[in-house]
């Protein structure tokens, strides 16, 4: 009972080393990744006028956001502009799989960073004396680096398609805008700067995790023999067993 209670010992030294310091950066970057993507809400507007009175424009709006199921984002108007039921018309595309994969993975990374930092700071000796924990940490780090590349690339492609689907191109694709009784002009679309930032942080995370892989590797048994040899060389030759 006493051993279990005294096992946790606060040691902030690992936070000053690359292993712990980079993990803090990974934790912060993960927060920015899922917050900038998962918290986005925007809208795109088109201006509609009814012929022959084309001087009077009315606004029709489609609101969209995470997880970016644009095919469920219907257009809304104060009334049936030009006799059209705009609610039955939606944007094009479903990009929820890429967006949710990216955000969900970022949340898991966020949680793992907390667990890893707790291990580094509270159980420093347990981590460094164990052969399994550093190896597990190293494998997770390598896998996370790869998944950051995959998830961010998929999300970047989806973001490009989202920008196209909410751009002036929608005027050409909306069926009511093709009718002779209506005239449509693109109005505006919410800036997607925060989504661009999410992509940047995704690739930044990949770089951080890829770089940190080396420092995690140095804690594993794959690298420890070289450290052991170095320490033996400084302290003198170790006699063979039995002598």
For each of these PLM feature ranges, what is it?
Residues 39-45, 123-132, 157-163, 192-195:
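Membrane-lumen (extracellular) interface motif
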Residues 83, 138, 182-184:
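Short, motif-level signal for alpha-helix interfacial/capping segments enriched in acidic residues
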Residues 36, 147-161, 212-215:
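C-terminal TM-helix exit segments that contain a strictly Trp-centered aromatic cap at the helix terminus
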């Amino acid at each position: 009972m006493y051993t279990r209670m005294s096992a946790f010992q606060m040691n902030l030294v690992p936070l000053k080393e690359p292993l712990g310091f980079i993990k803090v950066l990974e934790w912060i970057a993960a927060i920015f990744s899922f917050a900038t993507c998962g918290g986005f809400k925007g809208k795109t507007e088109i201006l509609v006028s009814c012929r022959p009175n084309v001087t009077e424009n009315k606004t029709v709006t489609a609101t969209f956001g995470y997880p970016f199921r644009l095919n469920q984002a219907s257009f809304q108007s104060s009334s049936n502009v030009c006799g059209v039921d705009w609610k039955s018309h939606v944007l094009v595309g479903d990009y929820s799989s890429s967006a949710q994969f990216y955000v969900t993975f970022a949340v898991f990374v966020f949680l793992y960073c907390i667990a890893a930092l707790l291990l580094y700071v509270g159980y420093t000796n347990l981590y460094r004396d164990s052969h399994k924990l550093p190896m597990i940490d190293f494998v997770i780090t390598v896998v996370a680096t790869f998944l950051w590349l995959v998830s961010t690339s998929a999300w970047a492609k989806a973001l490009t398609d989202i920008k196209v689907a909410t751009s002036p191109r929608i005027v050409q694709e909306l069926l009511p805008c093709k009718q002779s009784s209506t005239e449509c002009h693109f109005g505006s679309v919410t800036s997607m700067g925060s989504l661009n930032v999410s992509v940047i942080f995704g690739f930044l995370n990949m770089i951080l995790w890829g770089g940190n892989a080396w420092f995690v590797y140095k804690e594993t048994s794959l690298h420890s023999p070289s450290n052991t040899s170095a320490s033996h060389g400084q302290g003198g030759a170790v006699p063979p067993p039995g002598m």
